[in-house]
């Protein structure tokens, strides 16, 4: 599995303490859409991509008494969809804790992927691109503030297409 980093104890991106997996790829759709470098995570593009063993990551998670969830974030996890699915499949063999996936895609752009992810329990997806000069708002599903008013999280167990 290719990542640019792992944060073993993250207190920021979800209401539960998380292990955060940082994914290495993104098409920088936000920058293209708004015609400027607005990406909050652009500097991550310069990080070194490393290969990680999924079993090792899951073992570190299971043996950490603090983390209660997994967060997958940017760059863009859904641009590494095969790695995302492979990780979730292995993780679900040993644990049913929440998995939160942060994406800058809009819901209509990823319905096919949401249907695939829906087969797994306790998957939450934060949807929506960052829009500059927007007011942040509290998202009840994540239990945190999101940067733009168009962004929201859905629990895929409640998701209907």
Which sequence ranges carry the predicted segments?
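Canonical radical SAM enzyme core domain
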Residues: 42-59, 78-119
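Classical nucleotidyltransferase
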Residues: 111-112, 123-161
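Canonical Radical SAM [4Fe-4S] cluster-binding loop centered on the CxxxCxxC motif
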Residues: 11-52
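A cross-family glycoside hydrolase active-site/sugar-binding cleft signature
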Residues: 22, 73, 100-104, 128
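Conserved acidic residues
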Residues: 68, 122-123
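N-terminal amphipathic/basic leader segments beginning at the initiator methionine
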Residues: 1-11
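Glycine-rich phosphate/diphosphate-binding loops that line cofactor/substrate pockets in enzymes
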Residues: 60-65
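Conserved glycine-rich "GG(E/T)P / GGGxP" loop and the immediately following alpha-helix
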Residues: 66-94, 131, 136-143
